């Protein structure tokens, strides 16, 4: 730029040489001048304030220059639409090895920016990415929100860095410092800010959206998060294993060039927390990764990949066209034995794989390993220069955590199944479909023999039983015990989900010492007679400290050869003393079965009694695996809860009503409480009280629960409970017809995507129609908690 002050400004843009975009054939073929020269007269005719005149002149010059550059095509196409979004991508875990560990690798292509929920659900950025052919970023902020206090942990530093090539590299902590990076102190929030100059693409700053195209044109840069130094608890002399930071990505994506590829929104990202991984290869052969066939990772890849069956020559192997990024966030990455020379690739923490068509070992799936995305698209696997050392071949597979992302979709039209609009957020108490893969029988159990169970409540002298306990008054003794090889979590509509957190307040104890966490529970209630019920409780636990117990064992057997095989099971009277070992980190399914005499109240049943010798038991779903050991790798699916349903009545063996929050308020009640205000006007206090405590709905003429509801209310009030709380409990324990209709309609509308306000309004309207009354529910009068 050369000019005199406030006279003329001349800008010359030289475009010598070939453009970075190979698609601009028109500009290469025409014999025109490749230099753009812009002259702007910046002199102002009128006198103005010196500072203001200078600023306005600079802005005017800038606008004119930008306009001329756009006309000449130097800055690329104009954005058609821009979208700001903040994506929550997960957490940064603690460092358990003391070396450099990768915690996250964030790909910035809009169709790949997803959290690891394991579903095809998407947001506005992914939707726009599937509609436009090009994208770029105006800015990018990576926000790290601390999840621990500054004094809670020590010994670890985190680093956020920019990888402009999105290719796995062998980097030490010093190498990461050579990149554009930000070091973050644990316990403090931080933001890693990037500008357009850091994020520009090869086509005048733009990137291609379709991930089936050349890798260097589509992926864009990536953000990597590493930790260094073992994370230690400041309050305990032990390692800290929780999360350190919550990672959020705030940015503005711009799109241009409409080209709909609807199937790009269906790319999957998920996590497999318990998967056994091995690598194999020999000199001159491709590097192969093996995982169990029943693992969540293998099943997802198999379901989402298209494998050719007719294009391979004899003796050759073909692969799927679908590429997957694999990120190993566990410390076990350093323990994985890999044939040379690609040890650095696996220890670096992430790589790319493709499913090998038709190649399966007994119980495993195989994948070719690729050191870059472009190599995966070109089908150039990593070639080994040697084999695994002999002493390492016999090592057991390493159990690790894999976070995997589907990188491309060969077919870009509409998929077989429509994508889901919205999000499924696991919450405490939510019901999951849990697929359990059974392991080998636990000693003293053996194949083709009876399954041993713990019979009495006492243990041999000097030993203790295993108890699943909430507190000293509410616990159950372990009877059945089964080893679980792997656990896969799904939402109630069978969408893959992350594992929930352990159930708070519930733990596995041996002599008052915690040995395991409980992740999911289930109770099966079978009515034997009107006043006699069989209750089987299932507990899915993960052992935190390995242990062994000695118990008196017995087993179930069929009482006679005649009659219903599901209703004549007995327990052998004689017992056998044996030891049972539980391995640290292992999953186990523990059971307890009891007979309850009398009416069954709602809620979780704590009935700790031993198995009775002369009592017939029914074969319910919780006892199926306790008759004979199931073959290894057998899978069973249970619908389980992640919190304990609270009891609503007092009695022997049940949880008493001694807490302030007996029931968590349901969604409908919570919404109604939220819309109440202190400015509501009632006609009289008496009318308000009469309306508030009217638990007998006169519109429900066929309400069979009326007597029970009134009886429970009177009992609770006589025990000293307030009328408000007693009414609330009674209405929930024995809901009226109107209550049931409201709740059913409300939950159905919420699932379909309606807002809470609209859902509750429609639910009230349906309840009024069913009751035959016209009685305002939320408008014009106070919304009462029903």
Curated annotation (Swiss-Prot):
InterPro entries, sorted: Astro_capsid_N (IPR004337), Astro_capsid_p (IPR022027), Viral_coat (IPR029053)
Region Basic, residue ranges: 1-70
Region spans: Disordered: 1-60, 648-668
Recorded consequence of changing residue 421 to I: In strain: Oxford
Q: Where is the composition biased (Polar residues)?
A: 1-13
Q: Where is the composition biased (Basic residues)?
A: 19-29
Q: Outline the segment boundaries, as ranges, of region: Core attachment.
A: 394-423
Q: Region Acidic: which residues? A: 649-786
Keyword entries, A-Z: Capsid protein, Clathrin-mediated endocytosis of virus by host, T=3 icosahedral capsid protein, Viral penetration into host cytoplasm, Virion, Virus endocytosis by host, Virus entry into host cell
| GO cellular component annotations of the record | host extracellular space; T=3 icosahedral viral capsid
Swapping residue 754 to V leads to an effect described as:
In strain: Oxford
Consequence recorded when altering residue 276 to P: In strain: Oxford
Share an example GO biological-process annotation for this protein.
clathrin-dependent endocytosis of virus by host cell
The UniProt entry's sequence similarity note says: Belongs to the astroviridae capsid polyprotein family.
What name goes with this protein?
A: Capsid polyprotein VP90
